[in-house]
């Protein structure tokens, strides 16, 4: 059970939930739209039926594209983008939604090693803005380097939870994932 303000998240309506939580799934469709149009989709939970984007919405979209380094891609079709560029555009959409909580499932998917570090630094900056970031990362060194708190699951059950350094030192991740830790 996950609570927000004492209320089970499953009890929120879709639009209400989307105003609180933005989600970046690991795999997504690639619609035939321009990058900026996709980023604008993050603003839809904040719009009334039939209402157009406001200047404030456009500013959030521009900000999200700027911080993710995707402004130069705004007029390109998603299908024309590399996997890494597309991943950053999807993160921009998630940021333009302007929620307090971000769920990111493997946000470094499709990124080369340099882009992975850039993405995680950016996510750290988002967290420093006061946003709660929950990430799924299977790259253990990255997970332990870029997370304040870590949860380790084993066969769907909680195996360890706590500050990253303490969970790492516990040896649980090494046992669960069958790797040696140093």
Predicted features and spans:
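Conserved ABC ATPase signature
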Residues: 52, 77-81, 85
């Amino acid at each position: 059970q996950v609570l927000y303000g004492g209320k089970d998240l499953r009890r929120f309506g879709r639009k209400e939930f989307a105003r609180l939580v933005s989600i970046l799934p690991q795999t997504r469709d690639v619609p035939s739209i321009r990058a900026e149009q996709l980023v604008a989709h993050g603003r839809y939970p904040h719009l009334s039926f039939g209402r157009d984007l406001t200047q404030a919405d456009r500013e959030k979209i521009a900000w999200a594209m700027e911080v993710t380094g995707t402004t130069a891609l705004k007029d390109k079709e998603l299908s024309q983008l590399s996997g890494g560029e597309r991943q950053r555009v999807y993160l921009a959409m998630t940021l333009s939604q302007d929620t307090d909580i971000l769920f990111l499932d493997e946000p470094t998917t499709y990124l080369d090693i340099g882009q992975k570090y850039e993405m995680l630094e950016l996510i750290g900056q988002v967290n420093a803005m006061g946003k709660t970031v929950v990430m799924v990362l299977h790259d253990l060194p990255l997970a332990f380097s870029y997370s304040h708190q870590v949860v380790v699951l084993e066969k769907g059950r909680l195996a360890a939870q706590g500050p990253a350094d303490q969970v790492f030192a516990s040896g649980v991740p090494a046992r669960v994932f069958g790797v040696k830790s140093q």
